Amino acid sequence: MKIILNIFILIFILSGLTFANEVKIFEFTESELSKLDVRKVRGADNNTNYTVGSNENGNYLKAIANNAASGLGKEVKINLNKTPIINITWKVEKDLPGIKENTKKGHDFAARVFVIKKTGATLLSNRAINYVFSSNNEVGFNSPSPYTKKSIDNVLATTKENLNKWVTVKANVKEDFKKFHNLDVNELDGLAIMSDTDNSKLEAITYYQNIYFSAD
């Protein structure tokens, strides 16, 4: 009995270490959704419609953007020395074919997750990396936003390969801030989700699930 008890204690400790090395960002519940910071993009005609649901893998956020652009933000401190890897599970059901995403007229993404570092007193001074599920570009493509060089669009998934399929991707945020912004960032200040179609005037449907940071 003592041996069995010790085994259970060891399993519990190891499980605790595993969870300690993961930082979950969103629960995707009705209660959480009501508390998130909603920001409509200036000039957009409509807000993106966000709702929560669940499947066999847990809760998810569903986004419907019909000529719309608004994001859901959350202030959160992430220690990038301990957990530098962002993990995202997402699915694009309806994408945005034919647009040029690195131009102002086509700068829409069916799915994007921003990681944000405050580098000044105003929102405009912040630096961001915009991890996107592209409708037209290949995985690995990256470019500055056509609206500001302080935000970099980096393609982690594409509907050219995975339309209407759940995809799990990851990226080293600490390394990416150094690569794209030449910044040594030890701590993130916030994270945001957005599905937007205000430039193309099209409709996108996307699902987000299980967004967290990990050690590897």
Spans of model-derived segments:
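Solvent-exposed strand-to-loop "edge" motifs in beta-rich extracellular domains
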Residues: 89-95, 118-120, 174
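Extracellular carbohydrate-recognition regions
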Residues: 20-43
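Extracellular beta-strand ligand-recognition surfaces/modules
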Residues: 108-113, 149-150, 155-159, 163-203
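Short carbohydrate-recognition loop motifs
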Residues: 50-71
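Bacterial N-terminal signal peptides
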Residues: 6-15
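Extracellular/luminal beta-rich ligand-recognition
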Residues: 106-151
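Extracellular/lumenal carbohydrate-interaction signature centered on repeated Trp-anchored short motifs
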Residues: 75-86, 160-163, 184
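Extracellular beta-strand elements of beta-rich domains used
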Residues: 28, 191, 209-213
